[in-house]
Amino acid sequence: MAIYKVFFQDDKSEVIVRENTHTIYVEGNSEEEVRKYLKNRDYNIEFITKLEGAHLEYEQQSEDYKVEHIQ
């Protein structure tokens, strides 16, 4: 399992605007699995990145760091 950071907009019908970008963290086996997990949400996914090493450690220090686990 790995931790993925997902950048998204709240509404699929809206044009992507950087200032409206939100993030969530999802634990999964692959980017594809994370996309399948999120497909029923009305998210306009911009980008998904796998977090590892120092980058993951940095993100874990954020008060907004909460991981959703795929079941």
From Swiss-Prot:
The keyword Transferase applies. InterPro entries: RpoY (IPR009907). It comes from the Bacteria. GO terms for molecular function: DNA binding; DNA-directed RNA polymerase activity. One of its GO terms (cellular component) is DNA-directed RNA polymerase complex. Belongs to the RNA polymerase subunit epsilon family. This is DNA-directed RNA polymerase subunit epsilon. It comes from Staphylococcus carnosus (strain TM300). The gene is rpoY.
